[in-house]
Amino acid sequence: MGTVLSLSPASSAKGRRPGGLPEEKKKAPPAGDEALGGYGAPPAGKGGKGESRLKRPSVLISALTWKRLVAASAKKKKGSKKVTPKPASTGPDPLVQQRNRENLLRKGRDGPDGGGTAKPLAVPVPTVPTTAATCEPPSGGSAAAPPPGSGGGKPPPPPPPAPQAAPPAPGGSPRRVIVQASTGELLRCLGDFVCRRCYRLKELSPGELVGWFRGVDRSLLLQGWQDQAFITPANLVFVYLLCRESLRGDELASAAELQAAFLTCLYLAYSYMGNEISYPLKPFLVEPDKERFWQRCLRLIQRLSPQMLRLNADPHFFTQVFQDLKNEGEAAASTGGPPSGSSASTTSSSSARDSCATGAKHWTMNLDR
């Protein structure tokens, strides 16, 4: 008997897709399509359009994969550049081992052959030489000196005493003396000196001279010629030098002459030691004739210019003059007042010259303004 198989067109049409192929027999996409990001191969058309569409995505994908490879290689290079710490060596130091071996060999050479203890050192026993041996040297040469440790049975001689420091010579290192004085004290010393020098003026007092000085300084301050007071210890020493070398007691017969001479010294001191460039002449002028004032100034400049320069350049000379001014007040206090007679001025000038001549003294001052 035969079997008849009938196929209906409807059932066959259901199992087909519009493309004309059944679903079961549809082929899976190749592996290349998955690598292309799921893009399937387009159907081949006219003039090779399918091949050109396939080539364009492959170029893009190759560029992307190249960038990924470059980034991965850069990361590897960075990781390889990291310096790994060198592990500490756990083995013994070869230099230390070599030193240990050398120490062991040295100990073996120094010690005895069979024992492990070292031999005791031989100490020479001192012997007392005979008189003949000490007096008569051997015929072969000169007498040999005894060893330093033996000393011939006698204790070693004591070491020589240390040399004492010799006293300083009179003209050697300077002697340091502290001189302390305030501005008011130096003003009184200056007044006492002028009163003793001008012995012919019986009614002159130290306060009168200080009043002349302070009057000039106050006038310059009020008129605006200076910003600060001129009366300081250093300036008082300068004024004392000028007064000591210019004032003559036998030539000054009145207080007016003394005031004119003293104000001339003040004018030179202000011009030389003051902070301003120039000062007015009116506070320093008490006489109607200006020519006499300028003549006194020129005589003092020609005669005392080296000493004025030295007072600023040589600290030893300055301290000597400072001490002389301080001594003027002490002399007045010891005598009880300004002495009379020409012997006082002669003694004062001679003591000042003697104090300036002694160059070995160095005076250290504390100036209290």
UniProtKB/Swiss-Prot annotation:
Query: In terms of domain of life, where is this protein from?
Result: Eukaryota
| Bias (Low complexity) ranges | 122-144, 331-352
Which GO terms of the cellular component aspect does the record hold? cytoplasm; plasma membrane; presynapse; protein kinase 5 complex
Q: How does it sit in the membrane?
A: Lipid-anchor
Q: Where is the composition biased (Polar residues)?
A: 1-11
Processing after translation? Myristoylated. The Gly-2-Ala mutant is absent of the cell periphery, suggesting that a proper myristoylation signal is essential for the proper distribution of CDK5R2 (p39).
Positions of modified residues (Phosphothreonine)? T84
Q: Which InterPro entries does the protein's record reference?
A: CDK5_activator, Cyclin-like_sf
- What GO molecular function terms would the record report? actin binding; cyclin-dependent protein serine/threonine kinase activator activity; cytoskeletal protein binding; lipid binding
Instruction: Give the Basic residues compositional bias ranges.
Output: 74-84
* Single GO BP term: hippocampus development
Major place of localization? Answer: membrane
Which UniProt keyword terms apply here?
A: Cell membrane, Lipid-binding, Lipoprotein, Membrane, Myristate, Phosphoprotein
Signal peptide from the UniProt entry? none
Compositional bias of kind Basic and acidic residues: 99-112
Region Disordered, residue ranges:
1-55, 72-176, 330-369
Query: Where does the record place Pro residues bias?
Result: 145-171
Q: What does this protein do, in the record's words? A: Activator of CDK5/TPKII.
User: What name goes with this protein?
Assistant: Cyclin-dependent kinase 5 activator 2
